[in-house]
């Protein structure tokens, strides 16, 4: 929704959510998503199709207000090949950002299956507006040529995270196999002991209850086990 402050979506299993996974609308402050697992979300097609991550400045009818200091970190997203609603390939999903100030996108895994596609449509791309670090993408990821995707070199494109059971329907399927490149490859989120400073305090535990340190590199994704 819009006009929210310090709303945190964490430790959720989101599965077959028609509209998609992350949605942050306008006039939001210190809101975000961390330590969630998204499986086959965003099957809605048409004018308001589903998205993987959606940041918007929509704040009501005929009202646009940018959001500030929001975050998306340590989530695991699995996109299947086929949309079982219409039996077409899952090729409509986007990471779609409109105007917002300071959105922090760290340590997420996005797995795009064989026939699916993910488009990066970052319309406010600059270091002031967004910080993309230590994210891992695998599969057909297309960058919209009209809006260049500026990101830290730590972002890993075309890297298989090696899930325990890719395509499964349970959270345990998205733990990491031994030898996964996602182990100890994340960005350290620290800088504050205030648990309500979600951008500089990582909350201390992952989706599965494993400890997340403030001084050693975490895993990429929602699983911080070993």
Task: Indicate where each model-derived feature is located.
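Surface beta-loop-beta hairpin patches that serve as ligand-binding interfaces in beta-rich domains
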Residues: 171-173, 180-226
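Glycine- and acidic/polar-rich repeat regions and solenoidal domains
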Residues: 1-172
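Short amphipathic alpha-helical segments
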Residues: 158, 177-178
């Amino acid at each position: 929704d819009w006009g929210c402050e310090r709303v945190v979506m964490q430790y959720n299993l989101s599965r077959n959510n028609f509209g998609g996974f992350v949605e942050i609308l306008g006039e939001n402050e210190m809101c975000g998503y961390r330590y969630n697992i998204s499986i086959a979300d965003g099957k809605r097609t048409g004018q308001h199709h589903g998205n993987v991550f959606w940041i918007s400045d929509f704040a009501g009818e005929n009202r646009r207000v940018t959001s500030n200091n929001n975050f998306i970190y340590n989530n695991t997203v699995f996109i299947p090949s086929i949309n079982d609603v219409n039996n077409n390939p899952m090729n409509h999903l986007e990471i779609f950002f409109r105007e917002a100030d300071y959105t922090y996108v760290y340590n997420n895994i996005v797995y795009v299956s064989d026939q699916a596609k993910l488009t990066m449509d970052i319309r406010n791309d600059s270091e002031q507006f967004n910080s993309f670090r230590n994210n891992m993408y695998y599969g057909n990821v297309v960058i919209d040529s009209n809006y260049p995707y500026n990101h830290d070199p730590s972002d890993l494109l075309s890297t298989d995270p090696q899930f325990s059971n890719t395509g499964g329907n349970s959270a345990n399927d998205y733990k990491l196999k031994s030898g996964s490149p996602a182990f100890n490859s994340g960005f350290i989120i620290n800088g504050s002991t205030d648990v309500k400073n979600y951008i500089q305090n990582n909350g201390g535990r992952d989706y599965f209850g494993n400890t997340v340190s403030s001084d050693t590199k975490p895993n990429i994704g929602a699983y911080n086990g070993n």
